[in-house]
Structures are given as structure tokens and as C-alpha cells.
């Protein structure tokens, strides 16, 4: 499973990229709005930092306008992936983008059949939302597993991005249940590195070393 970071903050992206594990970036209008910067310029900045796919979301809800927006986004850099909501109009846009050779990430997926529809329309990626399903008492991992099984049975190459990741257990379970990618906020990425026993081990090694230097 690959790691993407879910942010529009350049510093967070640069820090994650230095870890050597970052394979891509996902953004959304809310994340860019928090940064208070021009949307297209920020996507350009991100693409200059990261070589992997960078998802940039359309704002329009009508297919023709999504297509116009997506074409402009795709011009920013070759690694831009146009992010499209899972709607009837979104599927129309995904088909058009697929015909144009523009990669897409279908977002706000909450059922296996939505993922299948998106894949058949030509989506490069589908993004099931784990945390939001958990919030309403559903098991997001069941959805990841269902999508992975359906894609495997039918030889579908669309990749599954586990989104709305809240904690390290989500990351582990997504990997176990067949997600190709997990897109993760910066604070969760930081938490993945840490374990209390690792910290204790380092402290013990240092203490033991200091004792040898006192002799």
C-alpha cells in the first residue's frame, strides 16, 4: 500500500516528502481554503514538490462545467489528477476525462456499487471515506474489502484510495483489506512513526551508553 498525504499545506507536504515514503497528494476545496491562497497556484506549487499524483478537485456540479474545470487543472502539471464527486454528473465527467486521457479520482464514495460505477466510467482512483462511515455506525473497512474483492473478481485496475483516515488503526486495516493507497493527514502520518516502546528503547540505549562513558 502506498502513502499519500491529505493536505494543501506546502510545509506539511515537504516534511512528509523528506520521509521518503510519500507517493502522492490529495487536496480538496476546504483544505485549499484553509491556506488562503490561489487554488491553481497552490496546486502548481505542490506539483513542483511531489512527483507523484496530485488530486485537485473540481468545484462545479454540472458535467460540462466539471470538464471545463478539469481540463484547466490538467494543464497545470502532468501529475495532476482531477478529483470528481461521486454523482451522476460526476460519472459523465469521468467518462469524458477518460476519453481525453485525463486521470481522475472519484471522491465521496460510500458504497461498493458507487466504486464499481466509477471504475466502469473510467476512474483512475476511487476514494471510499472510512472515518465518515465510522461516524454513522458503519464499518469503513467492510467497504474497502468489498471494493477490493469486486475489483479483483472483475479484473478492474482502478486503484482504491482509503480516505477520511483518522488514526493508525485505519491505516493498518486499510492495508490488510486491500486498499492500494491511504491518503493521510499530516498529524496521522506523524503518529505512524511513533510507538512508546520505541521511545523507551531509545532512552534505555542512551542511558546504557552514558554508563559506559562514565567508566
From Swiss-Prot:
Predominant cellular place of this UniProt entry's protein: cytoplasm
PROSITE patterns: TRANSALDOLASE_1, TRANSALDOLASE_2
Protein role: Transaldolase is important for the balance of metabolites in the pentose-phosphate pathway.
Keywords: Cytoplasm, Pentose shunt, Schiff base, Transferase
Enzyme class: transferase
Secretion signal span: none
Family: Belongs to the transaldolase family. Type 3B subfamily.
GO MF annotation terms: aldehyde-lyase activity; transaldolase activity
InterPro entries noted in UniProt: Aldolase_TIM, TAL/FSA, Transaldolase_3B, Transaldolase_3B/F6P_aldolase, Transaldolase_AS, TSA/FSA_arc/bac
Record HAMAP family: Transaldolase_3b
Active site per UniProt: 83
GO CC list: cytoplasm
A Pfam family assignment: TAL_FSA
Keyword Transferase among record annotations: yes
Protein EC: 2.2.1.2
Gene Ontology biological process terms from the UniProt entry: carbohydrate metabolic process; pentose-phosphate shunt
Source domain of life: Bacteria
This protein's record includes keyword Cytoplasm: yes
Protein name: Probable transaldolase 1
NCBIfam families the UniProt entry points to: fsa_talC_mipB (TIGR00875)
UniProt gene name: tal1
Subcellular location: Cytoplasm
Pathway the protein contributes to: Carbohydrate degradation; pentose phosphate pathway; D-glyceraldehyde 3-phosphate and beta-D-fructose 6-phosphate from D-ribose 5-phosphate and D-xylulose 5-phosphate (non-oxidative stage): step 2/3
Catalytic activity, as annotated: D-sedoheptulose 7-phosphate + D-glyceraldehyde 3-phosphate = D-erythrose 4-phosphate + beta-D-fructose 6-phosphate
